[in-house]
Amino acid sequence: MKVAVILPAAGLGTRMGKGTAEKAGTSRKQFMLLEGSPILMHTVRKFAASPRVGEIVIAVRAEDTEWVREVVTQEFPGGRVRVVAGGNSRQESVENALSSLSPDCELVAVHDAVRPFIDLDIMHAVFDEAAETGAAIVGVPAVDTVKQVTRGTTHVRVRATLPREKLVMAQTPQVFRHDLLLRAFQEARKDGFIGTDESSMVERLDVEVSVVPGSDRNIKITKPTDMELAHLFLREEAARSTLS
């Protein structure tokens, strides 16, 4: 069963910090260079390495489509990787990419463009789970104690301590049947619902979403310290590749 992959990459990267942005020449994390290549391209390569991925669609800001398309086609000239204009939010960007997919596509995986260390085995495990159940995400156990709070005008107060054994920290890929994800977006638009991930939108349809164990290495590069860790991970990957 072939999988279509959507990489939303239209974000502005406001959390990376001014110093890191000035050093990198851009505040947008997906375009920052990691060992000579944009983070986005490292992520694309991971999915392109899977024979189960039929197409990869990257959603970027409208003004970036031409130059990103040029960068992509230099490495992937066959049309398997495409670039489309995203929207003003992650949700709009994913929806724009979703509307461009072939109607006979069966499974759709949505993955953060700035998670370039997804493991191929985990990727295939979540593909398999979604093929069986219709909806699956990658997640890791919560290691910190999580508090539910109420925010007042002057104080933030603890309302409850959530049972850690019942919590997972959601990662990506998040993989769904094509028709199910389309319906989730249609319902969200109709209701004015804005989700922080695709799973939250599918959950609104009373659909059970399975969780496949993820990895602590599958980091989302968000802060300057994440870039330091990413350089380390990439050098480790290069060393393993040389040894093999």
Swiss-Prot record:
Site label Positions MEP for the nucleophilic attack, positions: 164, 220
The EC number(s) this enzyme carries: 2.7.7.60
Transferase recorded as keyword: yes
Catalysis performed (reactions): 2-C-methyl-D-erythritol 4-phosphate + CTP + H(+) = 4-CDP-2-C-methyl-D-erythritol + diphosphate
BP GO terms, sorted: isopentenyl diphosphate biosynthetic process, methylerythritol 4-phosphate pathway
InterPro entries xrefs: IspD, IspD/TarI, IspD/TarI_cytidylyltransf_bact, Nucleotide-diphossugar_trans
Function: Catalyzes the formation of 4-diphosphocytidyl-2-C-methyl-D-erythritol from CTP and 2-C-methyl-D-erythritol 4-phosphate (MEP).
Family indicated by similarity: Belongs to the IspD/TarI cytidylyltransferase family. IspD subfamily.
Protein name as catalogued: 2-C-methyl-D-erythritol 4-phosphate cytidylyltransferase
Organism: Solibacter usitatus (strain Ellin6076)
Gene encoding the protein: ispD
